[in-house]
């Protein structure tokens, strides 16, 4: 699947796809003309990346998940703790404003 098809299927910009590639999150196959070709595995990986970015998981943490340095569950639990801390902080500020 070429970049244009991935853009349409996943509603993602070519800039974002290239950024994910630059950051080492995905490595699409390049054909003899240099065009990027994405496999179904790449598509699933991009969907996971998009989900994690939607919930503000940092790129470095996503790299660790994809490279099996940490589990998906560990990163999500850590992220939930950070979000809960942020919520508590915002509630405190709201209470004292």
For the regions a protein language model found, what residue spans apply to each?
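Short, charged amphipathic alpha-helical surface segments
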Residues: 31, 50, 55, 61-97
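Basic helix-turn-helix/winged-helix DNA-binding cores
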Residues: 1-60
């Amino acid at each position: 699947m070429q970049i244009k098809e991935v853009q349409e299927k996943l509603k993602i910009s070519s800039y974002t796809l290239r950024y994910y590639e630059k950051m080492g999150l995905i490595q699409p196959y390049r054909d003899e003309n240099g065009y990027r070709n994405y496999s179904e595995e790449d598509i699933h990986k991009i969907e996971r990346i998009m989900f994690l970015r939607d919930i503000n998981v940092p790129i470095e943490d996503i790299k660790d998940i994809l490279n099996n340095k940490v589990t998906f569950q560990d990163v999500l639990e850590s992220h939930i703790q950070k979000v809960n801390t942020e919520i508590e902080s915002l509630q405190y500020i709201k209470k004292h404003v």
